Amino acid sequence: MNALLSNPFKERLRKGEVQIGLWLSSTTSYMAEIAATSGYDWLLIDGEHAPNTIQDLYHQLQAVAPYASQPVIRPVEASKSLIKQVLDIGAQTLLIPMVDTADQARQVVSATRYPPYGERGVGASVARAARWGRIENYMAQVNDSLCLLVQVESKTALDHLDEILDVEGIDGVFIGPADLSASLGYPDNAGHPEVQRIIETSIRRIRAAGKAAGFLAVAPDMAQQCLAWGANFVAVGVDTMLYSDALDQRLAMFKSGKNGPRVKGSY
C-alpha cells in the first residue's frame, strides 16, 4: 500500500475555511456513526470528560471512518504515553486540554513527532495509523497530516497565549469557555461580559497570529458570535445534551408539569 496520508480537516484550516463540529460524549460507536451521517465537518470524540477508554476511542474512529466528518480526539491529559496510543489507533487530529505555557505546548508537539524531531515511540508495524505497516514511508510523511490543537482555558494560559502561538507545530488554539470562566472568577458563567470580552480578544489574537481558532458553544447565538469574531472551527452542540433536551421536550408534550428541557450549566 503506497498511499499518501491526508487530513482534510487540517487542509481546510490552512485555507481558513470555517468548519462546524459536534461534541461526542456518549462513548459509543453507534452514536458516533449517527453523528457522522448528519454532515458535521468535524466530530470531537471526548476522552477528557466522557468515560472513554482507548478501545472506545478506537471503535468510534472506525465508526466514522467511511464518512466525510473528520474525527478529532481529545485525550484526558497531555500524557506522552497516552498521546502515543491515540496516534497509533489512527487519530490524525488531537485537541490537548489544559495547555498553560509554551513549554507545555512544545512538550505536546514533541510527543506527536517521531525522532529525531520528537519522542513518539516507533510502532508503525502494529499500528492502525500506518495500516499495520502497509503505508510505505509512514514515518516520513505523517507529520504533514497531523493536526495539533491545544486548549487555552485558564488565566495562566491567557498570560502566555502569545508564546503558545509562537510554538512551531501548533496548528490551532481552542478556547475552553467553562474552565476559562471559572479560572477568571466567574464559575459556570461563560456569558459574563468580562469573559465574553476575553473570549473575543483571544480569538482575534489567535487568528492574527495565523493559527486556527476554535470554540464550543452550546447556544446557537454564542456560536454565531464566535464565528463573527473569527473562530473557524466551532462545535455547536454536545450529543448527550442534545439527546437529553430532545427527551425532555418529547416528554413535556404528554406529561403535565413538564416545561421542556432542564437548565444546563456551562460546558
Swiss-Prot record:
Cofactor: Mg(2+)
Catalytic activity: 2-dehydro-3-deoxy-L-rhamnonate = (S)-lactaldehyde + pyruvate
Bound cofactor: record note: Binds 1 Mg(2+) ion per subunit.
Binding site for substrate: Q151, A178, D179
Organism: Escherichia coli O7:K1 (strain IAI39 / ExPEC)
One MF term in the entry's GO annotations: magnesium ion binding
GO CC terms: cytoplasm
Site features described as Increases basicity of active site His, chain residue numbers: D88
PANTHER family named in the record: 2-KETO-3-DEOXY-L-RHAMNONATE ALDOLASE (PTHR30502:SF5)
Residues annotated as binding Mg(2+): E153, D179
Entry keyword annotation includes Metal-binding: yes
HAMAP family found in the cross-reference section: KDR_aldolase (MF_01290)
Pfam families: HpcH_HpaI
Cited function: Catalyzes the reversible retro-aldol cleavage of 2-keto-3-deoxy-L-rhamnonate (KDR) to pyruvate and lactaldehyde.
Subunit: Homohexamer.
Protein name per its UniProtKB record: 2-keto-3-deoxy-L-rhamnonate aldolase
Entry similarity comment: Belongs to the HpcH/HpaI aldolase family. KDR aldolase subfamily.
EC code: 4.1.2.53
Active site as annotated: H49
